[in-house]
């Protein structure tokens, strides 16, 4: 319903589209919260009142007494690039108060590459079934330029707002072809480098926020043509990267990337490329992966934040590392987990899609000897996985006697090397029939709290929309608020609630250049109403949900519908939790459009009024 004004005698009555009554209001800037009533009209916060507002004629009133009213959360690290074409509502994020998502991370976007190349780039890396990624792109890819891509995304019945980065692998593939882009002997010509720079500039001109890259060669291609090759961006030289970063510098845009974990100098090169001192006093903001308290590197957390701050100060750099503010808990069906790509033997097994062929390989003695040698080799530098099979517990298995046991405990019982016990269990029960779990990082609450308050990090790395059977961090914002609230109650605060809200909203908007993240008068009305009494164990629970557009695949999700009372996008309440039990508005993601594509440099208020 559009707002309207009615004259009754000589008295004017202002009618709102939505009123959020008597909530504890956080504006997203870090200011202390106040109890206020918000009146929303034409997609904008029209009034922030200390007293009551006239509710006459208002079609939607949210009773927020005792609740927190916050700007909608921003998720800067998602892989919804294909899913947004199949479910523009992106329900798994929006139901947790997320109102803005960023696509095109980790060098992966679907802007320039054709549908088959894009599916090969995306599917194995992000563990989304290739057939559905390819189908989504073939059925919907009507664009050939960034401007057309943005128009196509913006034309969808979007639930949340969407912004995006251009992926370096996408860009490299479009210019070189996927074969040459993943060939270590190929170096782009001057003309090809110039074309990459031109195409990147066109994407930035169209409104994309920046570029994403990936230096770590752990991620592999899907498909049959170039299966198991590393991503194209990992083959780029620093000469190529510097040329593209210079385009970002000229435009004042951002780079998201990940250093090469096997080359410690790689991280330093990003600081130098970001530096104002070495680049004519014009730096480049960078968002890097990843700041975590990894079990494989227990001492790193004590120096990581300090080192980043020192380098930023000395070099005049603008580098922050993304941090997922929750325990990094992973699940795996057999070896279908990215950590196994660290091993050549793991990649060899993941190369095989046929279950029988994979089982035969896992049972082969020579293969096992090779795998053991790699597994036992001391790895210098960062590692994704702690490699401790005593810290890997079986949760599903045809042999019910093994459920609840770690692979290490089974190895002890059988007198085997832990890797052999692991492979034996997989072969005996059918590799993908054995589901197990481990926590690889962020397991120590005190260190996790320190990271959440560390100024050299920002909140991200949820990987929403990817690794469907491996992880579910869609509600990481709620989980951070729970920890901050619990610590405050215990008399050991590490982050005030208003600061936590800022870190999930306004701070991210400022760094990435997104027109979102605040909920002040005149701002676009993207909001979440949270019931703090339900920031409880439900936010940490394990759940699965069948995904119809992925052939009924059961993905890991989060379910805490009592926690989020309402989510609003662009002034429209699109989700009601609490007493409503988790309901989306009729037609949501189908014929009701609440979100839009947010171009770089556009302000939230201006967006609302022009929508």
Swiss-Prot record:
GO terms for cellular component: cytosol. Keywords: Hydrolase. SUPFAM superfamilies: Composite domain of metallo-dependent hydrolases (SSF51338), Metallo-dependent hydrolases (SSF51556). One of its GO terms (molecular function) is hydrolase activity, acting on carbon-nitrogen (but not peptide) bonds, in cyclic amides. It holds the Pfam family Amidohydro_3. It comes from the Bacteria. Belongs to the metallo-dependent hydrolases superfamily. N-acyl-D-amino-acid deacylase family. This is Uncharacterized protein Mb2937c.
């Amino acid at each position: 319903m559009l707002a309207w004004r009615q004259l009754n005698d000589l008295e004017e009555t202002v009618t709102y589209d939505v009123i959020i009554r008597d909530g504890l209001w956080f504006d997203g800037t870090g200011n202390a919260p106040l109890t206020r009533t918000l009146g929303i009209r034409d997609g904008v916060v029209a009034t922030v009142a200390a007293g009551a507002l006239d509710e006459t004629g208002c079609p939607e009133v949210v009773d927020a007494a005792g609740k927190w009213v916050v700007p909608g959360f921003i998720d800067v690290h998602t892989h919804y690039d294909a899913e947004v074409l199949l479910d523009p509502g992106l329900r798994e994020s929006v139901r947790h108060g997320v109102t803005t998502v960023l696509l095109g991370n980790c060098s992966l976007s679907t802007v320039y590459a054709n549908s088959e190349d894009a599916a090969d780039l995306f599917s194995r890396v992000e563990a989304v079934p290739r057939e559905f990624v390819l189908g989504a792109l073939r059925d919907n890819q009507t664009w050939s330029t960034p401007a057309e891509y943005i128009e196509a995304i913006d034309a969808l019945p979007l639930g949340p707002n969407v912004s995006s980065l251009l992926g370096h692998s996408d860009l490299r593939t479009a210019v070189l072809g996927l074969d040459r882009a993943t060939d270590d002997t190929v170096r782009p010509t001057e003309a090809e480098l110039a074309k990459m720079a031109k195409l990147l500039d066109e994407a930035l001109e169209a409104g994309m926020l920046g570029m994403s890259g990936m230096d770590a060669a752990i991620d592999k291609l899907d498909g049959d043509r170039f299966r198991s090759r590393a991503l194209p961006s990992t083959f780029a030289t620093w000469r190529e990267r510097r040329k593209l970063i210079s385009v970002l510098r000229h435009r004042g845009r951002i780079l998201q990337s990940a250093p090469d974990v096997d080359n410690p100098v790689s991280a330093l090169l990003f600081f130098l490329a970001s530096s104002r001192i070495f680049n004519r006093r014009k730096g480049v903001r960078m968002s890097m992966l990843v700041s975590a308290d990894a079990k494989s590197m227990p001492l790193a957390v004590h120096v990581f934040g300090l080192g980043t701050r020192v380098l930023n100060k000395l070099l005049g750099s603008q580098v922050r590392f993304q941090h997922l503010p929750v325990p990094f808990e992973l699940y795996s069906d057999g070896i279908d987990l990215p950590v196994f790509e660290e091993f050549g033997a793991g990649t060899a097994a993941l190369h095989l899609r046929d279950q029988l062929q994979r089982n035969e390989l896992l049972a082969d003695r020579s293969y096992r000897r090779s795998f053991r040698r790699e597994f036992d080799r001391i790895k210098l530098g960062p590692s994704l996985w702690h490699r401790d099979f005593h810290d890997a517990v079986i949760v599903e298995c045809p042999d019910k006697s093994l459920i609840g046991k770690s692979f290490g405990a089974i190895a002890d019982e059988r007198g085997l090397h832990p890797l052999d016990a692991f492979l034996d269990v997989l072969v005996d029960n059918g590799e993908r029939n054995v589901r197990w779990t481990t926590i690889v990082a962020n397991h120590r609450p005190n260190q996790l709290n320190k990271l959440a308050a560390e100024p050299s990090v920002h909140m991200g790395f949820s990987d929403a929309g990817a690794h469907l059977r491996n992880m579910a961090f869609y509600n990481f914002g709620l989980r951070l608020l729970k920890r901050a609230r619990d610590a405050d109650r215990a008399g050991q605060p590490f982050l005030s609630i208003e600061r936590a809200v800022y870190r999930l909203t306004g701070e991210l908007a400022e760094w990435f250049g997104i027109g979102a993240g605040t909920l002040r008068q005149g701002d676009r009305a993207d909001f979440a109403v949270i019931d703090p009494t339900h920031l409880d164990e439900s936010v940490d629970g394990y759940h699965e949900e069948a995904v119809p557009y992925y052939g009924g695949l059961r993905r890991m999700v989060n379910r805490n519908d009592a926690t989020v009372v309402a989510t609003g996008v662009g002034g429209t309440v699109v989700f009601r939790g609490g007493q409503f039990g988790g309901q989306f508005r009729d037609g949501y993601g189908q014929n009701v459009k609440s979100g839009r594509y947010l171009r770089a440099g556009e302000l939230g208020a201006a967006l609302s009024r022009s929508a």
